[in-house]
Amino acid sequence: MLNGYLPHFIADTLRESKTKLIHMSTDCVFAGNTGPYYEDSFPDRMIFYDRSKAIGEVNDDKNLTFRNSIIGPDINEKGIGLFNWFMKQEDSINGFTGAIWTGVTTLTLAKAMEEAVKQNLTGLYNLVNNESISKFDLCILFNKYFRNGRIIINPSDKLQLDKSLRHRRTDFSFVVPSYEQQIKEMAD
């Protein structure tokens, strides 16, 4: 309930002020069976969390909802994100070649938020670079920039899922860098 209600409550509370809500949604609003997904694609995932995130998307002419997936360091050492998981691995792992991803690093997200405020971006925007990468290839980049190639990454096709996001909007000049650029910048 909180994911669905709170963003709209905050937006309503801010209605008469100059303050803008920047809300984060997720690619999890989609089932992953028919990607890529655009801003106007119907959120078809039926799990409670995913429905609550879809309901919470604020799409109006004052506030902004960025829909994406993020990777990056987590202040919680027990964090469950892909990057934290990868950094805890010691020997070899399986990388899913059929799990397709289109997210941004937390550093890129912060830069995009700053630029969105400057450009007064509103509505719903899929914050992606309009390219896809497999979780296997993403782990290859983590390995290259964070582990000096020490982890053996075995390709696995056991998971087939495409939650790729794409954007069609042309009113935001921020350019999301390539995945390699984002991961390299995160490592620097």
Each language-model region and where it sits:
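NAD(P)-cofactor binding segment of oxidoreductase domains
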Residues: M1-I22
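Residue-level signal for the nucleotide or nucleotide-sugar donor/cofactor binding architecture
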Residues: L2, W101-V104, I133, L165, ...
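Active-site "gating" loop of Rossmann-like NAD(P)-dependent oxidoreductase/epimerase domains
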Residues: Y5, M24-I47
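Conserved cofactor-binding/catalytic machinery of classical short-chain dehydrogenase/reductase
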Residues: L6, K20, D50-G56, T105
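NAD(P)-dependent short-chain dehydrogenase/reductase
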Residues: M46, V58-T108
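Short, amphipathic alpha-helical "lid/cap" segments that border enzyme active or binding sites
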Residues: F83, T106-E114, V176-A187
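Mid/C-terminal beta-alpha module of Rossmann-like enzyme folds, strongest
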Residues: A110-D162
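C-terminal amphipathic/interface module of NAD(P)-dependent oxidoreductases
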Residues: G149-D188
